[in-house]
Amino acid sequence: MKILDWSQLDVAARTDALTRPVQTVAAQTRNAVAALIADVRTRGDAALREITARFDGVSLERFAVSEAEFAAAEAAVAPELRQAMQDAVARIDTFHRAGMSEGYAVETAPGVVCEKIVRPIGRVGLYVPAGSAPLPSTALMLGVPARLAGCRAVVLCTPPRKDGSVDPAVLVAAWLTGVRRVFKLGGAQAIAAMAYGTESVPSCDKLFGPGNSYVTEAKQQVAQSGAAAIDMPAGPSEVLVIADAGAQAAFVAADLLSQAEHGADSQVLLLSDSDVLIDAVQAQLEIQLAHLSRADIARQALAQSRLIKVQTLDEAFAISNRYAPEHLILALREPRAWLAQVEAAGSVFLGDYTPEALGDYCSGTNHVLPTSGAARAYSGVSVASFQNMFSVQAASKAGIAGIGECALILARAEGLDAHANAVALRMGVAA
C-alpha cells in the first residue's frame, strides 16, 4: 500500500488520495441490462429460462424452491453452521427490534390532531448474490428486518448452481428468518423479475440487496422507471481505520484485509498519527497476505488503497467525515470518547476487539450499508427500510376556526384561491 503524509499533500493530491476506484458503467453494460429487463418484462418466465441457461449454465423449468429442497438444505448444512446462523438471527432481531419506529399523535392546536402512522411495505424483494461464494449472512441481514416490519409478501432471489440447486446455507438462512418464497434466479434478470413480475415471480414494491455491476445497474434502471424502489446506492466494499500509536498492528492489518478480499475494486484506508504503527501495519499486511486464499484479489484492492499519516487524530476525523466510509473502525485507546466526532459513516466499530467482521455476521447490526460516500445522506438497512410512514390530520369545527385564518393568509400570499376557498367555506367567511 502507498504511504502518504497528509501534511505534504496539496489540495489536488488530497482529493486524489480519497478518490475511490473509478466506478463507471459502460454503455455496453447499460444497454445489455436494459435489454434483459425489457425481455423479462415482455416474455416473463420464458425469458428467464433462456437468460438463466445462457448466464448460469443450467436449464430450469421451475424457479421456485420446493419444500423438499428446503428440507434437503436443512440436512446438508452442518449443525455448527446452522447454530451460528440461529445465534446471529437472535442478535440481529434484538438490535433491530429495539430500533423500530412507532407512530405518534399530537394535538398541534385545540381541536387539531396530527398523527404519524407506520405500515409495512406490502411486497419486498431480497437479492442474495452468489458470485465467488454464497452469502447466507446477507439473507439474514435482509430477512430479519423484513419479518419484523411485517411485510405481507417477502420474495428472495439467489443464483442457481450448475446442478440447478441453491446453496443450502442460503436456503437455511432464508428459512430461519421466515422467508419461504425463494427463487433460483440471479443477475439483472432476477431484479427485473421482482420489479415487474412474471408468471412465477410476484412483482415487489421495493428491492434490497447487493450484487455485481449488472445487478446494481438493473436496480437503478427499475427504480428510475418507477417499477420498484430500491434500498440505497450500491458500490464496492470499503473500510477506513483511524488508529493511534497503541493500536495492534496485526489487528489493523487483518481488518484492512478483510475488506480488501471482497473484490479488486474494494478500497481500504488507514489514518494514523503514528509512523511506527503505519510501518508495522505495512509489514503485517505482507505477512498475513501469504496465508489468504484470496490474496491476489486483496493485492489488487491494496494497490488502490492508502496508509495516510496525519498530524493529529482531529485531522483524521475531518478526513474520515469527508470520505464518509461504509465501515469506520476506531482503533483508539478511548474510542467512545471520539465517537462524537463521527458525522458520516455506515457503521462504526469501537476499539481493538471489535473487528468489522463481527458486524458482517453476528454482532446484531446490519451489514447492508451505504458505500461510495453515500453515508453522508443514507443509512444502513433497518426495519424502517421495510416500512412506509404517512401522516394523518383531523380538525374539528372549532379546530379549523382556530387555525383557518393562518391557512387563508398563506394561501392568499401564494395566489392559490381554491386553497383559500376550501378553508373559507368551512369557516363561513369570505375567501
UniProtKB/Swiss-Prot annotation:
The lineage of its organism: Bacteria, Pseudomonadati, Pseudomonadota, Gammaproteobacteria, Lysobacterales. Binds 1 zinc ion per subunit. This is Histidinol dehydrogenase. The gene is hisD. Keywords: Amino-acid biosynthesis, Histidine biosynthesis, Metal-binding, NAD, Oxidoreductase, Zinc. Catalyzes the sequential NAD-dependent oxidations of L-histidinol to L-histidinaldehyde and then to L-histidine. Zn(2+) binds at residues 259, 262, 360, 419. NAD(+) binds at residues 127, 189, 212. One of its GO terms (molecular function) is zinc ion binding. Pfam families: Histidinol_dh. Its cofactor is Zn(2+). The active site is at 326 (proton acceptor), 327 (proton acceptor). Its EC number is 1.1.1.23. Pathway: Amino-acid biosynthesis; L-histidine biosynthesis; L-histidine from 5-phospho-alpha-D-ribose 1-diphosphate: step 9/9.
